[in-house]
């Protein structure tokens, strides 16, 4: 009775515990089946999977765990980024292509490099011997012997479990049982030492962030030194040639961090374009104002000439007839102030008149129509039915008797 009550209390305690967050990294050579395995666990079809470029992140719920799996690409050029994910991982899933015997040595070297990393050593490792459904696939014992798996895990003090499986045989609830059993084993071992592993993950993550900040500062310092050396060389070369060098004032922030966010760059470009447009508008307004001033001056000069011509005309004292004949006729002029000035200089340029559109059917060849065909002979007898038929000419025919003629 006492044991039953203790078991019930333990069950209630576990049931009330919050879900634990666990991060796993899935690594292995390219074409080993990592993405197919993740999709099968997630409940998606593992068929027609494209190679992973970089990494992909998958979140899923597994029992009392909220699992985040980082599926890392296995190409040679991408394996260098694996170490950036080791610090926040609670465990490792290493996928092996058991049917690719030619690359088994490369698999061994890669696995040894992963397990010997200081941020992976001591963490539980699950090895999935994938593609067991293909012909020529290596057995579990052969893989352990070829990879020297027992030696590697003992040297790095890692708990290890190997599961032969095939990721393409099912997904979701029908996923390969070996994959499901291996994942449960990995999560259970993490749960047994969750506090220690979580503390180690937090410590490694903080150290990695500090290291990244230090590397960032060192890169910025190297860039600054390179710029200073280049400016010094340009200044010395300008002094030797006897020319002055215009030094640009650089922002302290840009000197400290040469890599600026794209939003800042876009904002600066937009401001520069706005300034250029404003300067262009001011230049156009200045040109238009100068043209208007010239037109006003010309109008004033013409008015003064007209007034002088009127004053210089002598007053006539002769008779009205002579005055009318000698009166000076004023020449009509079109003053500039009566003209309509264009708003812009571009519109003032005369435009060549566009020819009107050609009429419909222009240049269409004329069709020479044939005359109407008429029947041969004269069929138009208007008085044919109004007159009697002409008499038939009687021709003499011989009778049976000689020289007898019927009249």
Curated annotation (Swiss-Prot):
Pfam family, one: Arf
Positions contributing to GTP binding: 28-35, 71-75, 130-133
Family annotation (InterPro entries): Ciliary_GTPase, P-loop_NTPase, Small_GTP-bd, Small_GTPase_ARF/SAR
Bias type Basic and acidic residues, positions: 202-247, 269-284, 340-349, 371-384, 398-407
Membrane topology term: Lipid-anchor
GO cellular component, one term: ciliary membrane
GO biological process: cilium assembly; formation of radial glial scaffolds; interneuron migration from the subpallium to the cortex; neural tube patterning; non-motile cilium assembly; photoreceptor cell outer segment organization; receptor localization to non-motile cilium; smoothened signaling pathway
Domain of life: Eukaryota
Main location: membrane
PROSITE patterns membership: ARF
Subcellular locations according to the entry: Cell projection, Cilium membrane
Deletion consequences: Embryos have a ventrally curved tail, ciliary defects and cystic kidneys.
An annotated Gene Ontology molecular function: GTP binding
Record annotation: effect of changing residue 28 to V: Abolishes ability to rescue a arl13b mutant when transfected, without affecting localization to cilium
Expression by tissue: Cilium-specific.
Keywords: Cell membrane, Cell projection, Cilium, Coiled coil, Developmental protein, GTP-binding, Lipoprotein, Membrane, Nucleotide-binding, Palmitate
Keyword GTP-binding on entry: yes
Membership in a protein family: Belongs to the small GTPase superfamily. Arf family.
UniProt subunit comment: Interacts with EXOC2; regulates ARL13B localization to the cilium membrane.
Primary role: Cilium-specific protein required to control the microtubule-based, ciliary axoneme structure. May act by maintaining the association between IFT subcomplexes A and B. Binds GTP but is not able to hydrolyze it; the GTPase activity remains unclear. Required to pattern the neural tube. Involved in cerebral cortex development: required for the initial formation of a polarized radial glial scaffold, the first step in the construction of the cerebral cortex, by regulating ciliary signaling.
PANTHER family found in the cross-reference section: ADP-RIBOSYLATION FACTOR-LIKE PROTEIN 13B
Protein known as: ADP-ribosylation factor-like protein 13B
Organism: Danio rerio
Gene transcribed to yield this protein: arl13b
């Amino acid at each position: 009775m006492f044991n039953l009550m203790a078991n019930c209390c333990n069950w209630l305690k576990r049931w009330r515990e919050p879900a634990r967050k666990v991060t796993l990294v899935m690594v292995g050579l390219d074409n080993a089946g990592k993405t197919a395995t993740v999709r099968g666990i997630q409940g998606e079809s593992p068929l027609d999977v494209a190679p992973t470029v970089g990494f992909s992140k998958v979140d899923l719920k597994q029992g009392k765990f909220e699992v985040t799996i980082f599926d890392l690409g296995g190409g040679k050029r991408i394996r260098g980024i694996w170490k950036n994910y080791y610090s926040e991982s609670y465990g490792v899933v290493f996928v092996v292509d058991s049917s690719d015997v030619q690359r088994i040595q490369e698999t061994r070297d890669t696995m040894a490099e992963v397990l010997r990393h200081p941020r992976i050593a001591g963490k539980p490792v699950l090895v999935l011997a994938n593609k067991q459904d293909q012909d020529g696939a290596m057995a579990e014992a052969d893989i352990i012997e070829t990879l020297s798996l027992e030696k590697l895990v003992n040297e790095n003090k890692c708990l290890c479990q190997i599961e032969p499986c095939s990721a393409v045989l099912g997904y979701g609830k029908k996923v390969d049982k070996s994959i499901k059993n291996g994942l449960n084993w990995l999560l259970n071992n993490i749960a047994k030492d969750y506090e220690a592993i979580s503390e180690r993950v937090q410590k490694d993550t903080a150290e990695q962030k500090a290291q990244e900040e230090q590397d960032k500062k060192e890169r910025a310092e190297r860039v600054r030194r390179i710029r200073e050396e280049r400016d010094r060389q340009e200044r010395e070369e300008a002094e030797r040639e006897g020319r002055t060098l215009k030094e640009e004032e650089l922002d302290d922030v840009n000197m400290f961090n040469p890599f600026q966010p794209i939003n800042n760059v876009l904002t600066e470009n937009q401001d520069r374009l706005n300034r250029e447009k404003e300067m262009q508008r001011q230049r156009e307004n200045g040109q238009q104002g100068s043209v208007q001033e010239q037109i006003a001056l010309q109008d004033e000069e013409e008015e003064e000439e007209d007034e002088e011509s009127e004053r210089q005309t002598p007053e006539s004292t002769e008779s009205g007839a002579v005055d009318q004949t000698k009166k000076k006729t004023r020449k009509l002029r079109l003053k500039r102030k009566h003209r309509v000035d264009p708003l812009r200089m571009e519109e003032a340029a005369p435009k060549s008149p566009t020819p009107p559109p050609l009429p419909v059917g222009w240049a269409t060849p004329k069709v020479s129509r044939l005359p109407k065909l008429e029947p041969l002979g004269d069929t138009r007898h208007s008085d044919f039915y109004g007159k009697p038929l002409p008499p038939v000419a009687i021709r003499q025919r011989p009778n049976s008797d000689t020289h007898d003629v019927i009249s």
